[in-house]
Design a protein with these regions (language model features):
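A short SAM/SAH-binding and catalytic strip from SAM-dependent methyltransferases
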Residues: 89-103
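Core SAM-dependent methyltransferase catalytic element
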Residues: 159-177
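Conserved class I S-adenosyl-L-methionine
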Residues: 122-149
């Protein structure tokens, strides 16, 4: 079984009205599900470097009548690359992105910058290459390595179990527990 965004998001303690950044939003699958979770009082920032994906998200949001998703053209690996305000985000979602990030130090620093002091980060990524359906084996970021990376910016693993499927892992990190 591969990761199921709908199931994972249903398990997350994200409150109505929260501000969420979906980093590396792709086609917006996670963004749209998160928009429903946070309700009209909340906001989802779909951050993506590929402009054609942002247009696709905007068109789909319009077609679905979703008004609380804002697209942001972003280089998520750079300081200020998300263009979001300092300490403005309750939840950061990093789904199937970590293995693609080249500048991981810049990436986690940008997450730390935008995350509120009480904020949380969900990381869902490949636990293995899985016969080349996932990333190349050399690009897989193991869960233990992700924990070390996020510990470098003061985030710690939360005691919440996320079932992300048999070929993925899911970890919630918090600034303060």
């Amino acid at each position: 079984m591969f990761s199921d965004p709908q199931k994972i998001i249903a398990e997350l303690p994200i409150p109505i009205g929260a501000s969420v950044a979906d980093l590396g939003a792709g086609v917006g699958t996670w963004s749209f599900l998160l928009a429903k979770k946070v309700g009209a009082a909340g906001k989802v920032y779909a951050c993506e470097v590929q402009k054609d994906m942002l247009v696709r998200i905007e068109n789909e949001a319009h077609a679905l009548g979703i008004s609380n998703v804002q697209t942001v053209w972003s280089n998520i690996e750079n300081h200020m690359g998300t263009k979001l305000r300092d300490q403005s985000i309750d939840w950061v979602i990093v789904a199937n992105v970590l293995f693609q990030v080249e500048d991981r130090t810049g990436f986690i620093k940008e997450i730390s910058r935008i995350l509120k002091p009480s904020g949380s980060v969900l990381v869902v990524d490949w636990s293995e290459s899985y016969g080349n359906l996932g990333p190349h084996e050399k690009d897989v970021v193991r869960a233990s390595d992700a924990e070390k990376m996020f510990a470098e910016i003061g985030l710690v693993k939360a005691p919440i179990i996320i079932n992300a499927g048999s070929h993925h892992y899911g970890i919630i990190f918090k600034k303060h527990i």
